[in-house]
């Protein structure tokens, strides 16, 4: 399986994402610059965190116009796994690949610490390695993680089981309905504010994020039969 880690000007979590895939999973991964126009050679697309284009205008607002985003949309339409973490989630929202918007944290401060999440839906290609309602520890690092959508969209997210992760015990940023991560209706595009790539080794404080990446690999292996 081959992963693409999309690199925008200002990305700063691309190396962590690469490490999680290459060193922890042992899968093939490649950095892809933001002006790439073809992602056909990749099986999964990863949009890392950071401050793309300096977060000018608002987080993800400029990155959505990068050349690579047309290819990301094509990958999503083809059913490939697309994961956006933190700034990557914000970019997916701005690009219309996920519903809703991101606002400043309720306390108007940048938050950087581990939080607990509950796995709301473990029947997705990103969460199959988790147990239903499993509580996991994943770090956050953001100033604009306050997810918001209108009531109709929220009802649809709930009905379709598109809310994959919720904050558990404490909502650190004021996010609507404690939402920490959502998928699209098809279930192949996940956006989440917490950083699973920073929780892939117990030495880092938690290895709970590794199951997310393993879930992607397991899904791909189950749906791609390799014949000799």
Curated annotation (Swiss-Prot):
The keyword Nucleotide-binding applies. It is found in: Cytoplasm. It catalyses: N(2)-formyl-N(1)-(5-phospho-beta-D-ribosyl)glycinamide + L-glutamine + ATP + H2O = 2-formamido-N(1)-(5-O-phospho-beta-D-ribosyl)acetamidine + L-glutamate + ADP + phosphate + H(+); L-glutamine + H2O = L-glutamate + NH4(+). GO terms for biological process: 'de novo' IMP biosynthetic process. Signal peptide: none annotated. Its EC number is 6.3.5.3, 3.5.1.2. Pathway: Purine metabolism; IMP biosynthesis via de novo pathway; 5-amino-1-(5-phospho-D-ribosyl)imidazole from N(2)-formyl-N(1)-(5-phospho-D-ribosyl)glycinamide: step 1/2. It holds the Pfam family GATase_5. Its main location: cytoplasm. One of its GO terms (molecular function) is glutaminase activity. Part of the phosphoribosylformylglycinamidine synthase complex involved in the purines biosynthetic pathway. Catalyzes the ATP-dependent conversion of formylglycinamide ribonucleotide (FGAR) and glutamine to yield formylglycinamidine ribonucleotide (FGAM) and glutamate. The FGAM synthase complex is composed of three subunits. PurQ produces an ammonia molecule by converting glutamine to glutamate. PurL transfers the ammonia molecule to FGAR to form FGAM in an ATP-dependent manner. This is Phosphoribosylformylglycinamidine synthase subunit PurQ. It comes from Geobacillus thermodenitrificans (strain NG80-2).
């Amino acid at each position: 399986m081959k992963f693409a880690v999309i690199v925008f000007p200002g990305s700063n979590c691309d190396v962590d994402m690469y490490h999680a895939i290459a060193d922890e999973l042992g899968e093939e991964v490649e950095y892809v610059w933001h002006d790439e126009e073809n992602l056909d050679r990749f099986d999964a697309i990863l949009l890392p965190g950071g401050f793309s284009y300096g977060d000018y205008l608002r987080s993800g607002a400029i990155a959505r116009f990068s050349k690579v985003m047309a290819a990301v949309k094509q990958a999503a339409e083809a059913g490939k796994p697309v994961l956006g973490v933190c700034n990557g989630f914000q970019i997916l929202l701005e690009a219309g690949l996920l519903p809703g918007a991101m606002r400043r944290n309720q306390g108007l401060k940048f938050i950087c610490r581990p939080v607990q999440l509950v796995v709301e839906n473990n029947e997705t290609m990103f969460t199959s390695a988790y147990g239903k309602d499993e509580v996991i520890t994943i770090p956050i690092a953001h100033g604009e993680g306050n997810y918001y959508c209108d009531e109709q969209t929220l009802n649809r997210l709930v009905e379709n089981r598109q809310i994959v992760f919720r904050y558990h015990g404490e909502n650190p940023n004021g996010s609507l309905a404690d939402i920490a991560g959502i998928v699209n209706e098809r279930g192949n595009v996940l956006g989440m504010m917490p950083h699973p790539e920073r929780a892939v080794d117990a030495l880092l404080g938690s290895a709970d994020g590794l199951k997310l990446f393993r879930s992607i690999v397991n899904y791909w292996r189950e749906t791609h039969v390799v014949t000799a």
